[in-house]
Curated annotation (Swiss-Prot):
UniProt-listed Enzyme Commission number(s): 4.2.1.17, 5.1.2.3, 1.1.1.35
Catalytic activity: a (3S)-3-hydroxyacyl-CoA = a (2E)-enoyl-CoA + H2O; a 4-saturated-(3S)-3-hydroxyacyl-CoA = a (3E)-enoyl-CoA + H2O; a (3S)-3-hydroxyacyl-CoA + NAD(+) = a 3-oxoacyl-CoA + NADH + H(+); (3S)-3-hydroxybutanoyl-CoA = (3R)-3-hydroxybutanoyl-CoA
Function in brief: Catalyzes the formation of a hydroxyacyl-CoA by addition of water on enoyl-CoA. Also exhibits 3-hydroxyacyl-CoA epimerase and 3-hydroxyacyl-CoA dehydrogenase activities.
Record has NAD as a keyword: yes
Site (Important for catalytic activity): 118, 140
GO cellular component: cytoplasm
Assigned keywords, A-Z: Cytoplasm, Fatty acid metabolism, Isomerase, Lipid degradation, Lipid metabolism, Lyase, Multifunctional enzyme, NAD, Oxidoreductase
Chain segments carrying region Enoyl-CoA hydratase: 1-190
Region of interest: 3-hydroxyacyl-CoA dehydrogenase: 310-708
Protein name: Fatty acid oxidation complex subunit alpha
Xref: InterPro entries: 3-OHacyl-CoA_DH_NAD-bd (IPR006176), 3HC_DH_C (IPR006108), 6-PGluconate_DH-like_C_sf (IPR008927), ClpP/crotonase-like_dom_sf (IPR029045), Enoyl-CoA_hydra/iso (IPR001753), FA_oxidation_alpha_subunit (IPR050136), FadJ (IPR012802), NAD(P)-bd_dom_sf (IPR036291)
CDD domains associated with the record: crotonase-like
Organism, scientific name: Shewanella halifaxensis (strain HAW-EB4)
Length: 708
């Protein structure tokens, strides 16, 4: 019996053939190496049939053209030669498609990403639908890779070097009208007439491509080799600054484009295949692909086994501050669920509404939505100063001050005013959920739902189950968080949960280094060089020095002496330094200069004279090993279920460098024995806070790893 085909050819009476890609048994199309012979046979058949006057390439999937190459085939590559052959195989097929003597048109509806866009680029014309799900881009850089199917060569020739580099170096995805404006597609039409438009294009023949939309300045730059060299040099400098040398893919992308534009497409494709192979085998891409697979896996999980989540039709948010406003905003705009915000003051409610409106209005200004859509989404958010209109709330998210008595009162109020099924989800950042649930008559409905600030940008939420939380409550809360566009990790109850617990020791160590004479700039630069998006002092300013001061005593009380924050930091609070929020912290705020400057008076407040500035790798290592050690303790204590969750929590919650794969992947890279040695060295110099976790010592003795 014949296997089901992926590529099916149908001939129309007008001489146009339709080639439909439909991977059997999958919801989305992805490109796989085994498709090579099949598509080559189809192309040979088309070439041999003189009755075919034009070809239109379409997808058989709803709302998806081609989502990219199947990433799992990269893990099957044992050598760089294997990876290079994958790229070269793609080149052969796409070159065959491009060299067909008849017009070839890609009719794009839905996601057209990575290898999918490279397939479309090999066609002579492209038309896309105006479907909101139609997005185009080359996001390979986000996996530590580069477009390996000719994308580094065809994209700059179509849209210009500057635009192509921007797309490839950021991995950004374009909406239909953006793609049309830059010349990536030749037309963007309603989905209902997409096929008809593509057929008409094919019948019209190979007309010269529309001139790409470029500024006069870019035309001058890109029109000469000297101008292009300026573009490449500038891109190289920006990449070096942004990546700190930690990510090899961006520099290789620039080199592919440079070589292709200088020495011709054949040379460019050769360089592309070679660089692609090197990146596939690199530890950085391996780590970033592990993050991709982990998040893909987690999307399928309920957090509570086979238990089905309950439907959430209405949400209430207690507190209209930054967190409350952000939570209500993602509930209405992302999850499209009505949210009612309660605050004791009208000011708080106004702030929550203004917060949501500002975010939606950005979408209008960027033409991502119409004013009518914005207003309809705003209508989903209502406000109250009393417990009115909330009887039917399915989830109540509490986002009030870190005060246990206040949270107890909230629990009692909600149980009195809402239904028996209502879930009480606390956004506490440090208080154990079990302690909050002590005030509940229905503790099985109480759960932690810890968001990170700013809520609309940070992808992670911690779903915290205490010992009496029901499986249904967990499953419903996880499903709700996913609807908000979040990546949830289920963690067990305990002070600081997972993310804030590992972050606290990292921050405390940075504070110790500051008190030893390291400068604020040096500390921040050392950790940025290591791979964090911001340094610890900047982070403390952003989070709030006062917030850190409130959390530390809770962690110290519950978890022990190693969480004790340096007492010298009390002097910062006495000087009314809260960070960015009151314009007074480690850095100066409110000035006209773009670059941040350290507030030099912070040293005198702390009674310090900076000037030690130890070697940057040593500074970073001292902070990072504290985080790694505590992550292992969290696994030991079953705060996190598995190393995978610990990696995702650290990357998405605090910006742990993705190219290292997360704390547990990084420990595997370092080796447990090596990490124990580093910790014991610090323990002998700085004390018991560096004592290695028992599990780490055991792994060092046995020579085991977290991942196979």
């Amino acid at each position: 019996m014949d296997m089901e085909k992926t590529f099916n050819l149908t001939r129309r009476d007008d001489g146009i053939a339709i080639l439909t890609m439909d991977v059997p048994g999958e919801t989305m199309n992805t490109l796989r190496s085994e498709f090579g012979p099949e598509i080559s046979d189809v192309l040979a058949e088309i070439k041999a049939d003189t009755s075919i006057k034009g070809l239109v390439l379409v997808s058989g999937k709803k709302d998806s053209f081609v989502a990219g190459a199947d990433i799992s085939m990269l893990d099957a590559c044992e050598t760089a030669t294997d990876a290079k052959q994958l790229s070269q195989q793609g080149h052969v097929v796409f070159n065959e498609l491009e060299s067909l003597p008849i017009p070839v048109v890609a009719a794009i509806n839905g996601a057209c990403l990575g290898g999918g866009l490279e397939l479309a680029l090999a066609c002579h014309k492209r038309v896309c639908s105006l479907n909101p799900k139609t997005m185009m881009g080359v996001p390979e850089v986000q996996l530590g890779l580069l477009p390996g199917g000719g994308g580094t060569q065809r994209l700059p020739r179509l849209v210009g070097v500057t635009t192509a580099l921007d797309m490839m170096l950021t991995g950004k995805q374009l909406r239909p009208k953006q793609a049309l404006k830059m010349g990536l597609v030749d037309d963007a039409v309603p989905e209902s007439i997409l096929l008809r438009t593509a057929v008409e294009m094919a019948l019209a023949g190979k007309r010269p491509a529309k001139k790409k939309h470029q500024s006069f300045f870019n035309k001058v730059l890109e029109g000469t080799s000297a101008g292009r060299n300026i573009i490449f040099d500038q891109a190289g400098k920006q990449v070096a600054k942004k990546t700190q040398g930690n990510y090899p893919a961006p520099a290789k992308i620039i080199d592919c484009v440079r070589q292709g534009m200088t020495k011709g497409m054949a040379k460019g494709l050769e360089v592309e295949a070679s660089h692609f192979a090197d990146l596939v085998m690199s530890k950085e891409s391996g780590a970033m692909r592990s993050v991709f697979f982990a998040t893909t896996e987690m999307k399928k999980e309920t957090g509570a086994g086979d238990v089905e989540p309950q439907k959430v039709n209405k949400v209430m948010v207690l507190g209209g501050g930054l967190m409350g406003g952000g939570i209500a905003s993602v509930t209405t705009t992302k999850a499209k669920i009505p949210a009612r915000v309660k605050d004791i003051s009208e000011t708080g409610l106004s702030n929550a509404l203004a917060y949501a409106y500002k975010l939606l209005d950005k979408g209008v200004k960027r033409r991502h939505m119409t004013p009518a859509v914005r207003d309809n989404l705003m209508a989903l958010m209502t406000t109250t100063t009393e417990y009115k209109g909330i009887k039917d709330a399915d989830i109540v998210v509490e986002a009030v001050f870190e005060d246990l008595a206040l949270k107890h009162q909230m629990v009692k109020d909600v149980e009195r005013e809402c239904g028996e099924h209502t879930i009480f989800a606390s956004n506490t950042s440090s208080l154990p959920i079990g302690q909050i649930a002590e005030a509940a008559s229905r503790p099985e409905n109480v759960i932690g739902l810890h968001y990170f600030s700013p809520v609309e940008k940070m992808p992670l939420v911690e779903v915290i189950a205490h010992e009496k939380t029901s499986a249904e409550t967990i499953a419903t809360t996880v499903a709700f968080a996913k609807k908000q566009g979040k990546t949830p990790i289920v963690v067990q109850d305990g002070a600081g949960f997972y993310v804030n617990r590992i972050l606290a020791l990292y921050m405390n160590e940075a504070a110790q280094l500051l008190l030893e004479g390291q400068s604020v700039e040096h500390l921040d630069k050392a950790l940025i060089k290591f791979g964090f998006p911001v340094g610890p002092m900047t982070l403390l300013d952003e989070v709030g020095i006062d917030v850190g001061a409130k959390i530390s005593p809770i962690l110290e009380k519950e978890l022990g002496e190693r969480f004790k924050a340096p007492t010298a930091f009390d002097k910062l609070l006495a000087d009314d330094r809260k960070g960015r929020k009151n314009g007074k912290g480690f850095y100066l705020y409110g000035g006209k200069k773009k670059a941040k400057e350290v507030d030099q008076t912070v040293y005198s407040v702390l009674g310090l004279k900076p000037g030690v500035d130890t070697e940057a790798t040593e500074v970073a290592q001292r902070c990072v090993v504290q985080m790694l050690n505590e992550a292992v303790r969290c696994l030991e204590e079953s705060i996190i279920a598995c190393p995978r969750d610990g990696d995702i929590g650290a990357i998405f919650g605090i910006g742990f460098p993705p190219f290292l794969g997360g704390p547990f992947h990084y420990i595997d890279t370092l080796g447990a024995a090596n990490l124990v040695k580093i910790l014991e060295n610090y323990q002998s110099r700085y004390g018991s806070r560096f004592e290695p976790a028992a599990k780490l010592k055991q792994m060092a003795e046995e020579g085991t790893r977290f991942f196979s």
